[in-house]
Design a protein with these regions (language model features):
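N-terminal alpha-helical interaction modules that lie
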Residues: 1-91, 97, 106, 111-115
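Short, solvent-exposed interaction modules
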Residues: 102
Length: 115
């Protein structure tokens, strides 16, 4: 039996979505991350950093906190993606630094949801 070639269902011919710069620089410590999220609640990177920091504590309470922070970052990111032309599919490249807040929040959400 000859091998079949199947179409890649994940392949998307859409152009990659490139988010604009985040309103906050990446916070370096928990206090900076809290201050950044308070100043700019739409900051993708602030929520991602808060989630990542909470994941490192590895307690039940910090896991719930991480999930909430990651979920907030994820939804703030979806809002930004849609404002920039994303329609629910298509590449969001890691190489474009402003996309990293979304991708990091998505990663943190997946980790927190499994704890």
């Amino acid at each position: 039996m000859a091998p079949e070639t199947r179409r890649n269902l994940l392949a998307d011919p859409a152009e990659p979505t490139l988010l604009p710069a985040d309103p906050e620089p990446e916070p370096g410590d928990p206090a900076e991350a809290v201050a950044a999220a308070r100043r700019h609640p739409a900051s993708r990177i602030a929520w991602a950093v808060l989630a990542e920091q909470s994941l490192t504590d590895a307690t039940d309470t910090s896991d719930i906190r991480a999930y909430a922070f990651a979920r907030t970052g994820y939804h703030r990111s979806l809002d930004a993606l849609r404002r920039n032309g994303w329609r629910g599919s298509g590449p969001i490249p890691w190489e474009h630094e402003p996309n990293r807040g979304f991708l990091r929040a998505l990663w943190a959400l997946s980790v927190a949801a499994q704890r």
